[in-house]
Design a protein with these regions (language model features):
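Alpha-helical transmembrane segments in multi-pass membrane proteins
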Residues: 31, 286-294, 317, 321, ...
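Membrane-water interface of transmembrane alpha-helices in multipass transporters/channels
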Residues: 303-318, 384-397, 427-428, 460
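Core alpha-helical transmembrane segments of integral membrane proteins
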Residues: 274-341, 346
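Hydrophobic packing positions in regular secondary-structure scaffolds
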Residues: 1-265
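Non-transmembrane, extramembrane segments of multi-pass ion/lipid transporters
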Residues: 245-281, 330-354
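Re-entrant/interfacial helical elements at transmembrane boundaries that shape
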Residues: 330-341, 417-421, 432-433, 445, ...
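Juxtamembrane/transmembrane-helix interface segments of polytopic membrane transporters
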Residues: 294, 298, 302, 368, ...
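Membrane-interface segments at loop-to-transmembrane junctions
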Residues: 273-282, 346-361, 392, 396, ...
Length: 460
C-alpha cells in the first residue's frame, strides 16, 4: 500500500538518477514493501533498484519475490549483483530458488557461491524433494547444557545476527545431538549464573530430516511453534524449519487440494507459467476418466428404455434428480476431506461419519423431496403443466427418489475419502466431479427403481 502511494516519487527519483535518496528511502521500509514496489516497475528499473540497495537488504527483498520473477531478475542482473544476492540469501530461500531452476542453470549459480555457502547449498539440495531437508536452514543458535545464562547471552550477541530466529535456543551435547529447545524468554528472565541444565526440561518436538513437508506441517499445527529443530537419523541437530516456510507449504497443500477437488491433476507450476501441453494433459486425464464414467449413465438409461417409452414424463425430472445427488455428494466429500486435512477426522471415525451423514442425507433429501412433491402438485393445480391423471404418483415418485438419491450421494461422498485413505491414496483425489459422476450413474438406477415400485400398474 505504501509503495503504491509513493510510486510517483520513486519513479521521479529513478528518472533523476538520485540513487542516494532512493537507497535511504528503502532502508526505512520493510523488505516486503520494497519487493511490492519493485514488482510494479518495468524490468530495467527493477534491476536499477537492486543495484542501489545494500547487499543484505537486496537479498532480503529478493526473498520476497516470486520464483518466476527471481529467475527473470537473475538473467537481467550483472554478474556481481547475482553473486552478492545469492551469497546473502538465507539457505532455505536459496534452496527453493535453485530447485525450481533447470539443472544446468542451478549448477552454474551454485558455482558463484563461496565455498561455505556452496557446501550448504549442495547439502540441502541433496535431500529428497518434498522433504524437510529441503525446507530447513542451518542458521540457528545451539548451546551446551553446562553453560550459564551469561554465556548463552554473550554467544547470542556474537553469533545471533545470522540466525534464522532467536525465539528458540537449542541445547546439544558434545556430539551435536539435540537435547532440548529453550525459549529465549527463559534466558532473559533467569539469573545470569543459572546453568542451562537447570532451565531445560527435555520436553521438545523435533522433525526428521527425511520427513515429508506434509508431516512437518501437521507437527507445526500440533505444537504451535514458530520453529522446529530438524535432526538426522542419529539425533544430531542439522537445521531448523520456521513457520514462514510452513505457511508456504500450507498454501501449496491447499492449492493442490483445491485443484484435485476441481477434477484435475495438481499443477506443479503456477497457472501463468505452465506450458500449454502440460496444462491440457493434466486437465484431460481426469476429464477422460469422468467422461467414461458418465458413459455408464447412458448404459444405465438403456436398461430402462422401456420404462421411459411408457412414461416419458419421467425423463423430464432426470436432471433434477441426478444433479441433487451429485451436489449433496460433493458437499459431503468436501467437508470430510477438509476435516481430514485439519486432523479432525481419522480412519477410525468412519462410523461416526456414517451415522452423522445418514441423518444429514435423509434430512436434506426430505427437504428437497418435499419441495419437488409440492412443485409438481402446484404446477398441476395451477394448470401450468399437465402431468396426467397420475400426477400425484409422479410427485410421490420424484419426492421419494430425491430422498434416496440425496441420501446415497451424501453417504458416497462422505465415505469415498475414507476408502482412499485406507488404500494409502490422497483423499483429495475423490474430487467433487468424480463423486458427482459416481452418483449420476447410481442415482439413475435409484430413480427408475423407485418409479417402478410406485408407478407399477399405472404408468408402468
Amino acid at each position: 500500500m505504501v509503495g503504491k502511494l509513493l510510486a510517483p516519487e520513486i519513479k521521479s527519483l529513478i528518472d533523476a538518477r538520485n540513487f542516494n535518496a532512493l537507497r535511504e528511502l528503502f532502508r526505512e521500509w520493510p523488505p516486503a514493501d520494497v519487493a511490492e514496489v519493485i514488482l510494479d516497475l518495468p524490468d530495467d528499473e527493477q534491476v536499477i533498484i537492486f543495484r542501489v540497495l545494500p547487499a543484505a537488504l537486496a537479498a532480503d527483498v529478493f526473498e520476497y519475490i516470486g520464483i518466476e520473477e527471481q529467475q527473470n531478475l537473475l538473467r537481467a542482473m550483472a554478474h556481481e549483483q547475482v553473486v552478492g544476492i545469492l551469497n546473502e540469501m538465507s539457505p532455505d530461500d536459496r534452496t527453493a530458488l535453485l530447485e525450481e531452476m533447470p539443472s544446468a542453470a542451478a549448477r552454474q549459480l551454485i558455482k558463484l557461491l563461496t565455498p561455505e555457502e556452496r557446501r550448504i547449498a549442495t547439502s540441502l539440495l541433496g535431500y529428497p524433494e518434498g522433504s524437510v531437508g529441503r525446507l530447513m536452514t542451518p542458521d540457528f543458535i545451539a548451546v551446551h547444557e553446562d553453560w550459564t545464562v551469561q554465556q548463552v547471552l554473550d554467544y547470542v550477541r556474537t553469533y545471533g545476527h545470522d540466525s534464522e530466529t532467536l525465539n528458540l535456543v537449542y541445547v546439544v551435547d558434545e556430539r551435536g545431538k539435540l537435547i532440548d529447545d529453550v525459549r529465549m524468554r527463559e534466558f532473559l528472565l533467569r539469573p545470569l549464573t543459572t546453568k542451562v541444565s537447570e532451565i531445560r526440561d527435555e520436553n521438545f518436538a523435533a522433525l526428521k530430516v527425511n520427513d515429508s513437508q506434509e508431516e512437518a506441517l501437521n507437527v507445526f499445527r500440533k505444537y504451535d511453534r514458530v520453529a522446529l529443530p530438524v535432526v538426522d537419523s542419529n539425533g544430531v541437530l542439522v537445521g531448523i524449519v520456521t513457520s514462514d516456510d510452513m505457511l508456504d507449504v500450507a498454501e501449496e497443500e491447499a492449492t493442490e487440494d483445491i485443484q484435485k477437488l476441481g477434477g484435475l491433476e495438481a499443477l506443479d507450476e503456477p497457472y501463468t507459467t505452465i506450458p500449454f501441453l502440460r496444462m491440457v494433459k493434466k486437465r484431460a486425464t481426469w476429464l477422460i476418466v469422468l467422461f467414461l464414467g458418465e458413459m455408464l449413465t447412458a448404459t444405465a438409461m438403456q436398461g430402462y428404455n422401456g420404462e421411459i417409452e411408457k412414461a416419458a414424463i419421467l425423463a423430464m425430472f432426470l436432471p433434477l434428480i441426478i444433479s441433487s445427488g451429485g451436489n449433496s455428494g460433493s458437499q459431503a466429500t468436501t467437508l470430510v476431506i477438509r476435516a481430514m486435512a485439519l486432523g479432525e477426522l481419522r480412519l477410525r471415525d468412519w462410523w461416526r461419519v456414517v451415522r452423522k451423514e445418514l441423518l444429514s442425507g435423509f434430512s436434506l433429501g426430505l427437504i428437497l423431496g418435499t419441495i419437488g412433491f409440492f412443485r409438481i402438485s402446484l404446477w398441476q393445480y395451477l394448470h401450468i403443466f399437465d402431468y396426467g391423471n397420475y400426477h400425484w404418483l409422479i410427485a410421490l415418485t420424484v419426492g421419494a427418489a430425491l430422498i434416496g438419491v440425496v441420501l446415497w450421494g451424501t453417504l458416497s461422498g462422505a465415505m469415498l475419502p475414507f476408502l482412499l485413505r485406507r488404500l494409502g491414496l490422497d483423499p483429495a483425489t475423490s474430487s467433487a466431479p468424480f463423486v458427482a459422476t459416481l452418483v449420476d450413474v447410481t442415482g439413475l438406477v435409484i430413480y427408475f427403481n423407485v418409479a417402478l415400485f410406485i408407478l407399477r400398474g399405472t404408468l408402468l
